[in-house]
Amino acid sequence: MSPRPEDDDLVIEPADDEGLHYGNASMEGTSTGQRPYIRLTSQLRNATKSSGDEVRFKCEALGTPPLKFIWLKNNGPVEKTKRVKIRDKENSSRLVITQLDVLDSGYYQCIVSNPAASVNTTSVLRVNNVPDAVKLSQKKGSHHSTKHIAFDEYEDYEMMDRGRLPDEEDADLYRVPDSAAGSNYAPVAVSERWLDGIKYRVGDCVQYRGEACRQYLSNKFVMMTNESREEMYDIDRNLRAAMLFINGAPTISQKCRQLSQAVACHHMYKVCESDSNNQIVSICKHDCDVIQNDECPSELALAAQHELVGDTPKALFPLCSRLSSTSNCIPVMSTALQSSPVAEVNRGHLTHWCYVNSGTQYEGTVAQTSSGKQCAPWIDSTSRDFNVHRFPELMNSKNYCRNPGGKKSRPWCYSKPMGQEEYCDVPQCPSDMYPHLNDKKVEGSTKGGVSESVTALWDSLDPTMQVALVGGGVFFSLLLLLLFCCACCCRAKKKSQKTRHQNAHCSSAPSVINSAANSAYYRKLNGTSTPIMGRVPPHVEMTSLLPSAQHLGPPPYPMDQHLQQARRFPSQEPIDDNSYKVFEITPSQLSVREKIGEGQFGVVHSGIYTSGLFAPEPMAVAVKKCRHDATNAERAQLEQEIRAVATFDHPNVIKLIGVCYMDNSLLAVFEYMVHGDLHELLKVRVPPADHDMGGITEANAEFLYIATQIALGMEYLASMSFVHRDLATRNCLVGDTRTIKIADFGLMRTSYGSDYYKMLHRSWMPVRWMSKEAIEQGRFSEASDVWSFGVTLWEIWSFGRQPYEGASNQQVIELVANRHLLECPHNCPTNIYSLMVECWHENIERRPTFSEIRSRLQSWSLASPAHSILQQHNNRAGSHSGSSGAGRPPTHQRGYPSQKLHRRVEGASPLMKRHDANYAYSEDGDSD
């Protein structure tokens, strides 16, 4: 075991560098001058406990300066309570949780940091629920044999096992991480870590397998002269940078480039005679004198001015006077001239180790992002802005990092597998290196010269003058903005006054109002956009357009009068109606087929839409319309729903194709997925009893893909301030390639009658998917949709089972009120069920948002699909992993009669509402 710092002032730095992260001696907080380092000495173990038990985690590390410990649960800080205690010491930290609850399940991470680096270790805690009867028997049996152990009595925990598995102890003993050298060093590629896997000891001779001096030191042995592998990698790194600078300098001859590289390699690396003989062979003194005096005198003089000659660690060339005249030496003259000449550097391109300015001319071979993901080939890019057709130079760039067109601040690429734009882990060249490779404007353009002149003029100004100019510009911009706002307000005021005057004038002309011909004329005049969307200002409610009773005569058609009146008042002023413009479909383009379902506020039919802009061939659609006996309020409700969904444009939300006037009725035409809904797909995919682990892994990967799409769609709806109120698998339609689209047709389908319950003074409600505040108070918000999303996840991983199956709807209401949560589905990953429990948090402020859920699901999809699968071999009968109290009645018990199915023909209302405030039911029970 490695030495550990004791309690006195003596700090012992480990003798080896196994798993060490080093920093720079000049880092902040290193007052002793000692090189900062950090190493994690133990790993957290996964734990499975029962509710009521306690768990103890210990995190240990070594390092200097002093270490800082942070505990996280599911990426959030662990809060200290009466049950949760944290004690930090100099080199360890302990987390103790007593009286465990199923809500304590999750990922626990210990992060240790100091100025050198930051390391971490993670454990998965799973807490299983234990029935009350079992708890009582355990408590009685152990009352006289055990006692509660105080937190201060855990001192013997210091000597416990450090949590390291045997295979973890022996694996990768000598592997150094990419970040071991600190943030100021450019990481070395994995293929260039030629010392990894070798027992490192100062003074040993090791065969050189590096990159910088491969041309001269191949198959030769070099002495390990530095304290760690990383410092030996620094030699290769510095040599590569220096040689690239020399090769790019136009004043250095081709011969001197070859000679300087050979001399630098044999000087910075101490060459041994053999692996068994540790005697160093130096450069021949005669060759050194010839190079210094005859071949490259000016180049060596320039190097001496920059302190590159001598025996310092940065010196590339030796002092010839200090070399011995022995015959056992290295003839660098013949070695350099016999090797292949150094290729001329293309002045228009950059070398592979760093980039200049924004990296427009970078042509290196780095193919990894800063987050460690592999880059996707440019030829596979489907982006309209960055592809091989727009930038032909990307054709031969494979999957290397580039900055085509200089649109980004540094080289980047599309990362696998999601195709996200990410910056690459490429260092930037020093500011004074490669001045001829600075980004230039296109030749023949005068804009580049003007911008450079302005930049030079700005740099020449005094800082006080620069601040004054910036302040004046900001003040002038604010003044212009204020004047513009005043002008807009005045124009809007005049416009509203003129509109009121025109409306008053139009109301005195009943012959025009009651003319159906004029109504059709104005529709034709205004184009194909539906007048109800484009001719009513957005802030006017549709119910306000209902005419007064004294002006209503016998309607010429059975359609609602306020819809006709909205058509008869074409605005004399142009109105910005882009947000509500809906495509109008002619009756000849739409064929209405069989009825799919029926609710209080409408009927849904399947249909075929032809000759449309959205599809050159016939496409399946869903047609929603009012019932033939619908009231004006119900027709206005359909109108309001069209307003709501008209602006929706997202690949995971059902899209309104247009509206159609057929048989004097208004029809809303939606896209429809011919593969049915997600619930039907899940029931078909129920696995057999003897399914293997491979099938579970494949199913989990597909489920995660489906859940991510639902989260994306709900995130979009939340950003549009809309609340769905009925999110479930029955309302998720399945398209080609498993594309999921969120809809709200489930309420209208009789096959899902058992999913809804007619509540007192309310409509039919999906109580099995509703949160406590939605059931008891009628409060709907994004938080209540998040609760429904958690139940939808439960549906997915249980292959379409009904939540709380076996219990009646009234019993479900009581279970939700008493915090009886759904149990963890069989073979459900721990992180997925942990997310479900977070969605069901009693405090709505503690539930995650859809943006957080989407981000978390996307990050999990990048990991191995089987990453979080925990086998559930224990007997699950009678247990309830998601409850904070007594277990919910197990499914399919005879003591709980199944709910009688009711066919709903009334009481429903549109499910998606604008979320201007938390939606609440009124006292009279009306849902609007």
Swiss-Prot record:
Positions of ATP binding: I596, G597, E598, G599, Q600, F601, G602, V603, V604, K624
EC number: 2.7.10.1
Sequence ranges on the Extracellular membrane side: 1-466
Domain Kringle: 353-429
CDD domains according to UniProt: CRD_TK_ROR_like, Ig, KR, PTKc
Coiled coil regions, renumbered to chain: none
Bias type Low complexity, positions: 873-888
Region spans: Disordered: 1-34, 873-928
Cofactor note: Can use both Mg(2+) and Mn(2+) in vitro and shows higher activity with Mn(2+) but Mg(2+) is likely to be the in vivo cofactor.
Domain Protein kinase: 590-870
Disruption phenotype: RNAi-mediated knockdown in a lin-17 n671 mutant background causes 8 percent of animals to produce more than 22 vulval cells (overinduction).
Cofactors named for this entry: Mg(2+)
Keyword set, alphabetical order: ATP-binding, Cell membrane, Cell projection, Disulfide bond, Glycoprotein, Immunoglobulin domain, Kinase, Kringle, Magnesium, Membrane, Metal-binding, Neurogenesis, Nucleotide-binding, Phosphoprotein, Receptor, Synapse, Transferase, Transmembrane, Transmembrane helix, Tyrosine-protein kinase, Wnt signaling pathway
Matching SMART domains: IG (SM00409), IGc2 (SM00408), KR (SM00130), TyrKc (SM00219)
Glycosylation-annotated residues: N24, N46, N91, N120, N226
Predominant cellular place of this UniProt entry's protein: membrane
Expression by tissue: Expressed in AIM neurons and in several head neurons. Isoform a is expressed in some head muscles and in several head neurons. Isoform b is expressed in several head neurons, in procorpus and isthmus pharyngeal muscles, body wall muscles, and to a lower extent in intestine, seam cells (V cells) and distal tip cells.
Catalyses which reaction(s): L-tyrosyl-[protein] + ATP = O-phospho-L-tyrosyl-[protein] + ADP + H(+)
Keyword check for Glycosyltransferase: no
UniProt-listed SUPFAM superfamilies: Immunoglobulin, Kringle-like, Protein kinase-like (PK-like)
Disulfide bonds: C59-C110, C205-C272, C213-C265, C256-C296, C284-C329, C288-C320, C354-C429, C375-C413, C401-C424
rRNA processing listed as a keyword: no
Role this protein plays: Tyrosine-protein kinase receptor for Wnt ligands egl-20, mom-2 and cwn-1. Involved in the final positioning of migrating ALM, CAN, BDU and HSN neurons during development. Involved in the anterior-posterior migration of QR neuroblast descendants, QR.p and QR.pa, by maintaining QR.p cell polarization, probably through mig-2. In addition, plays a role in ASI sensory neuron positioning and functions. Regulates asymmetric division of V cells (seam cells) and CA/CP neuroblast, and axon outgrowth.
Notes concerning its domains: The FZ domain is involved in binding to Wnt ligands egl-20, cwn-1 and mom-2. The domain is required for the final positioning of migrating ALM, CAN, BDU and HSN neurons, and maybe QR neuroblast descendants during development and for neurite pruning of AIM neurons. Required for the establishment of ALM polarity. The domain is required to establish correct polarity in ALM neurons. May play a role in QR neuroblast descendant migration. The kinase domain is dispensable for ALM, CAN, BDU and HSN neuron migration, V cell asymmetric division, acr-16 localization, for the positioning of the nerve ring and probably for the negative regulation of neurite pruning of AIM neurons.
PANTHER family: TYROSINE-PROTEIN KINASE RECEPTOR, TYROSINE-PROTEIN KINASE TRANSMEMBRANE RECEPTOR ROR
Protein name from the UniProt record: Tyrosine-protein kinase receptor cam-1
Source organism of the structure: Caenorhabditis elegans
